[in-house]
Design a protein with these regions (language model features):
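A glycine- and Lys/Arg-enriched "phosphate-lid" helix/loop adjacent to the NTP-binding pocket
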Residues: 26-28, 77-130
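Conserved, well-folded catalytic cores of nucleic-acid-processing
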Residues: 46-53, 81, 104-107, 129, ...
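NTP-dependent small-molecule kinase module
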Residues: 124-169
Length: 169
């Protein structure tokens, strides 16, 4: 089977009154990334919960990570836990993405994405922290997707890449 794990959803589902939830709110409202130690700790805890509840089987399931690793350090620290088969790099014009993310925030009541200035700051964080992750993995494992296209076209591109990887002819 296939299991999708979004680090953003993982953080947004935290109780804002909990230690990790309040830390996430502190960073996300400023457009900053949660420190690697806390992110990895939460990821490992979440994965253990999924495995213990039967939602994920390391022997049977393919895990789609969304939003993690967010830094080269996270990639290095996760290397012992995951075997990366493929990395989808969704690339688009920054201002178009700011508008899209802002619109989604309003529709889905996602406060961490509601302020366009905060979203722009996250793009700066991406350039500084996340873009180097692309250099960590071999180029042969990276596929770039035009995320500036219409959402259905983006989905089509992703499905096409996954079909080639999962069901080679």
């Amino acid at each position: 089977g296939f299991v999708h794990l979004s680090s953003g959803d993982m953080f947004r589902n935290l109780d804002p009154q909990s230690e990790l939830g309040s830390v996430f709110l502190e960073y996300s409202t400023k457009g900053e990334l949660v420190p690697d130690d806390l992110t990895i700790r939460l990821w490992r805890h979440h994965m253990a919960q999924m495995a213990n509840s039967g939602q994920f089987s390391i022997e049977k399931d393919v895990l789609f990570l969304d939003g993690i690793p967010r830094s080269r350090e996270q990639a290095e620290r996760l290397a012992d836990n995951i075997d990366v088969l493929l990395l989808l790099h969704l690339k688009a014009d920054q201002e178009a993405m700011v508008e899209r993310i802002h619109g989604r925030a309003l529709q889905e009541n996602r406060l961490d994405d509601a302020n366009p200035d905060i979203v722009r700051r996250r793009f700066q964080e991406y350039t500084a922290e996340t873009a180097p992750v692309l250099d960590y993995y071999p180029a042969s494992k990276i596929r770039t997707i035009d995320a500036g296209a219409a959402p259905l076209e983006v989905l089509r591109q992703i499905i096409e890449v996954l079909q080639v990887m999962l069901f080679p002819e």
